[in-house]
């Protein structure tokens, strides 16, 4: 039988999933995106060359790997074409390596218009979305009015459905948000111009994955964002609009849940967050600046500066529970080089003085939480690019061991730099 490995983020996204997926796909036949949209930003560095992917799975650069966009992904046709064009200009035969589910909901210009109009209307209470129409597209999906990739097979019917939904959303845009209406004809023309390209890549994803499993193929499932941004389990309402957790694999791809063999949680050696929302361990002064600059903490999708803080092991433990993690990949360990001391949050103190070791479910419950820290010695030696576990400074090894102890999960992979080669694989998920 084949092995199905899930790679997902355990924090608020930006943990370094793209690099890890790219590394592990050396042994995979398929790489599958199962949720999110082009709000993701997965950065790959291979032999010094940087590639940023937002929608196409990170396995696309591998010659013998087929990349799949599953039904749980909301797909923006213009964003997909932009990525395809950029990759093809570099000699990557995208159309030979990429497949789509016909059940992918389409993100169209009215979704983007609604996203931005709503954020503007929220003012100081804005969620901090990427403004790419992700949430409104998922809303249309759940309301059963959304258009999907499969609708493009019948262009005449697509045009009729599109007209109805444009009128529906324009009423809200113009009358409630006082924003400009979306031009139906332009939307139709733009989508139909690339419809045949999209439909040519359509496949029955669930059937493909089932047969791949029976054949013994290795499959990698690539998560986007992070566990703490999950629509159900994250810091609601400061969350994304999809299930970023392991449960999203089955619903977002059609793979039977019992076929998942290993779940790899990507955990950054410290914490970051983009946009608004709770962040108990956030740092604002010298150490926060160190993490931000040395870690190059600027969003691959939006360019926004990420908020930075100490590792929150309480939040990561929540990710362990929800995802039934098999192991961790620890990323950006090298960013901690040079710090005299390093802290790990192992609990919270409530405003009434009570100590707790779990995260609240809603954002309101995080208000007034005081992190309870353990302080460990830092290290002055460089860990950048180290590929031998035994060559790491003892203080770094102690830090790694403590993360394993407080989370109850082994660290199977350690990343010490952005390049594919700057990685230590202590236990390969496909062999676990």
UniProtKB/Swiss-Prot annotation:
Binding site for substrate: 300-306
SMART domains for the chain: Adenylsucc_synt
Known pathway: Purine metabolism; AMP biosynthesis via de novo pathway; AMP from IMP: step 1/2
Subcellular locations according to the entry: Cytoplasm
GO biological process: 'de novo' AMP biosynthetic process; IMP metabolic process
Binding site for IMP: 14-17, 39-42, 130, 144, 225, 240, 304
Keyword Ligase annotated: yes
Cofactor notes: Binds 1 Mg(2+) ion per subunit.
Record keywords, A-Z: Cytoplasm, GTP-binding, Ligase, Magnesium, Metal-binding, Nucleotide-binding, Purine biosynthesis
UniProt GO cellular component terms: cytoplasm
Catalytic reactions of this protein: IMP + L-aspartate + GTP = N(6)-(1,2-dicarboxyethyl)-AMP + GDP + phosphate + 2 H(+)
Primary localization class, coarse: cytoplasm
The protein's role, per its UniProt record: Plays an important role in the de novo pathway of purine nucleotide biosynthesis. Catalyzes the first committed step in the biosynthesis of AMP from IMP.
Subunit description: Homodimer.
Protein name, per record: Adenylosuccinate synthetase
Gene that encodes it: purA
